[in-house]
């Protein structure tokens, strides 16, 4: 080792490593554990050196979901920094959502210093350093991560970062977790001791296509099918898949149902779009394709046909993070759905005869008629505007849809009003819808900000219930929106409670004591004014309870957002 070589802290090399793995942003909720990194960032800034830009988030839920939104928009995973065990705990719900959605994000947290009497730079120097050391910090998020690691020495800082990035970006993708004690970050190393790990030699593993025999087997089944059905939830994470799936469905006459969609998987105006509930089609299908879907239907409500032949095409067909998963699959195939569907379409085109094309065209025509009937039904539902103090959410969502462009992005976290959003606000372009993969409510606020950060030219609309609005840490999201000039429209469909809780109780105990007493433990305060919360953060706020006021209120909110200011439309809708 050359004694004249420059020496730098682990934190310095850590920032270099973050650059090398290609992070654009670090979404941060800093604490005492990050002092060496903050010092290194200041040094980089003074020297004019490149490093990821930092976005400060008052709550970790905002930070993690914001990173996820940016990742969805760009296809490049990002980094999040939080404070020791407490920040990790605040991040756990968001990590759950990212795990289920297979979104690659690197969550980084410090650990309490391990020296107590000044033995090393970075030693414990405040009360919290003694109380923020659990026996197993990573256990908080272990169920939701693909990989975890504690950095033992700065000499492998870049190696650890490359490993984290490789794991999170390898299919099936997902979040990873890295921790580091403060003394490790302050330790110094010469430049010659630190090695880089370039992506071209240490990069991620991507899902591939299928062998010709598997493609041929699926094609054979489809060529003979009379009532083919395809169910998907997240094939549209790759925008190119949407057009391929549409062409395949039209060519082969396949009904496509999106059950709990995370993205636009098929344009909602496609003649083959079969809506969002597969129940009727399940009973009739003779050939079924599950394509990138975790929960294709609810077996207790929608029994499948035991005679249906199923093929499951998925980046994760074994559902390795689901302790119990028993949906049928005569053929289970892991791979990239875009490549597989494109190969399947080519195989069908090569083998289809005139009779097949005639039958497929007839199915497409019949599906188109069914689609028109669904749209007519949705339009009829929207004609009921509601009454004073209880706006019909169908009417509100239909009115909002008319004010949006096809390229605008909708985040659907309306939960029990989610089907209303789906029915009244069809999205026809890839990348214009984001739904909830996990069970952690409150994802859409942070994700909306991340999407807006990545695509500032787009209008981003977050639709939530009042219960979900609380979960989304709105003070934090409104603060980030204001500080970083990321205007988003939030629509709160306020039914004064948790409809999901009430409905779940009635499903299990339809004639029980809760129903008799009318108490479901689900009623929230009806007197909140979320518009005032928005105004306190410098955003535009509207509280609307009269149907006649809806259209003008939406227009004012969109004018504010398109003028650079976030808006919250608090709408009093049909109560529980």
Placement of each model-derived feature along the sequence:
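Conserved short loop/turn motifs at secondary-structure junctions
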Residues: 233-238, 384-385, 465-468
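Phosphate/pyrophosphate-binding active-site segments
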Residues: 1-5, 152-155, 307-414, 518, ...
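N-terminal cationic-hydrophobic initiation segments that often serve targeting/anchoring roles
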Residues: 45, 71, 168, 249, ...
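Short, well-ordered beta-to-alpha junction loops that form the rim of enzyme active sites
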Residues: 179-183, 233-234, 413-417, 571-574
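N-terminal alpha/beta PP-like core and its mobile active-site loop of ThDP/TPP-dependent enzymes
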Residues: 2-351, 406, 478, 487-490, ...
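Thiamine diphosphate
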Residues: 116-131, 282-285, 325, 333-334, ...
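Active-site diphosphate/adenylate-binding microenvironment
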Residues: 11-21, 29-41, 368-457
């Amino acid at each position: 080792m050359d004694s004249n070589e420059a020496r730098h802290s682990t934190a310095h090399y850590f920032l270099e490593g973050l650059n090398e793995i290609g992070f654009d942003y670090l979404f941060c909720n800093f604490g005492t554990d990050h002092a060496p990194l903050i010092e290194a960032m200041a040094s980089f800034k003074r020297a004019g050196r490149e490093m990821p830009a930092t976005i400060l988030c008052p709550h970790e839920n905002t930070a993690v979901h914001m990173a996820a939104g940016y990742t969805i928009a760009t296809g490049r995973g990002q980094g999040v920094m939080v404070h020791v065990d407490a920040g990790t705990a605040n991040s756990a719900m968001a990590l759950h959502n990212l795990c289920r959605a297979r979104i690659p994000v690197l969550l980084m947290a410090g650990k309490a210093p391990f020296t107590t009497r000044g033995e090393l730079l970075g030693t414990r120097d405040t009360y919290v350093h003694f109380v923020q050391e659990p026996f197993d910090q990573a256990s908080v998020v272990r169920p939701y991560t693909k990989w975890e690691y504690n950095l033992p020495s700065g000499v492998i800082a870049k190696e650890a970062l490359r490993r984290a990035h490789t794991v999170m970006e390898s299919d099936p993708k997902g979040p990873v977790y890295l921790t580091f004690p403060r003394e490790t970050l302050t330790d110094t190393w010469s430049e010659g001791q630190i090695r880089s790990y370039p992506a071209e030699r240490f990069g991620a593993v991507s899902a591939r296509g299928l062998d010709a025999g598997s493609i041929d087997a699926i094609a054979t089944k489809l060529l003979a099918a009379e009532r083919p059905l395809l169910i998907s939830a997240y094939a549209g994470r790759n925008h190119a898949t949407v057009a391929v799936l549409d062409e395949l469905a039209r060519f082969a006459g396949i009904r496509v149902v999106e059950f709990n969609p995370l993205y636009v998987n098929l344009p909602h105006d496609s003649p083959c779009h079969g809506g969002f509930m597969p129940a009727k089609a399940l009973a009739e299908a003779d050939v079924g394709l599950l394509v990138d879907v975790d929960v294709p239907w609810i077996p207790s409500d929608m029994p499948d046909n035991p005679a249906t032949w199923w093929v499951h095409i998925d980046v994760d067909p074994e559902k390795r993070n689901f302790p119990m998963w028993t949906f049928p699959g005569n053929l289970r195939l892991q791979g990239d759905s875009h490549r597989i569907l494109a190969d399947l379409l080519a195989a069908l085109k090569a083998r289809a005869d005139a009779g097949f094309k005639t039958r497929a065209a007839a199915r497409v025509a019949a599906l188109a008629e069914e689609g028109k009937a669904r749209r007519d039904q949705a339009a009829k539902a929207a004609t009921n505007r509601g009454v004073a103090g209880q706006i019909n959410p169908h009417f509100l969502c239909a009115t909002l849809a008319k004010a949006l462009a096809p390229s605008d992005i909708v985040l659907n976290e309306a939960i029990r009003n989610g089907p209303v959003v789906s029915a009244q606000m069809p999205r026809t372009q890839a990348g214009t819808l984001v739904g909830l993969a996990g069970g952690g409510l409150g994802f859409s606020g942070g994700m909306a900000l991340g999407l807006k950060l990545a695509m500032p030219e787009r209008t981003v609309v977050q639709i939530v219930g009042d219960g979900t609005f609380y979960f989304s840490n709105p003070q934090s999201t409104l603060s980030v929106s204001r500080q970083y000039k990321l205007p988003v429209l939030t629509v709160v469909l306020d039914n004064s409670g948790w409809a999901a809780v009430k409905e779940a109780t009635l499903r299990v105990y339809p004639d029980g004591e809760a129903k008799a007493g009318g108490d479901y433990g689900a009623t929230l305060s009806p007197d909140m004014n979320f518009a005032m919360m928005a105004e306190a953060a410098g955003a535009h706020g509207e509280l609307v309870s009269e149907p006649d006021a809806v259209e003008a209120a939406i227009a004012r909110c969109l004018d504010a957002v398109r003028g650079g200011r976030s808006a919250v439309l608090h709408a009093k809708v049909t109560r529980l």
